[in-house]
């Protein structure tokens, strides 16, 4: 009849929402200003295929960020969405590790591994803490 209010760790919620907001901001920059964003991340000048793939990734980040922020009032949904976000960050880190084998991609590859892994670590921390108190 009455649902018990689930306690939410405020720090974990804040971290999850910051990850969502950062993902939206970066995704928007990549989607709307693809070449300047890629240059800022030290990628070599992309061709049309690279620009298209970067825009796909930017769009993905916008949507995952929006889903994260939209789940701010629902602890169970926020936990599920941050898990998806974390898995995407791990996949990104793996893709960057593979790309870093190419000398032209070494700097953006290593940077991508570090940033993807850091985001996943923070996200998994939040995910674990959002699991209920």
Predicted regions and their residues:
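Short amphipathic, positively biased membrane-proximal segments
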Residues: 1-133
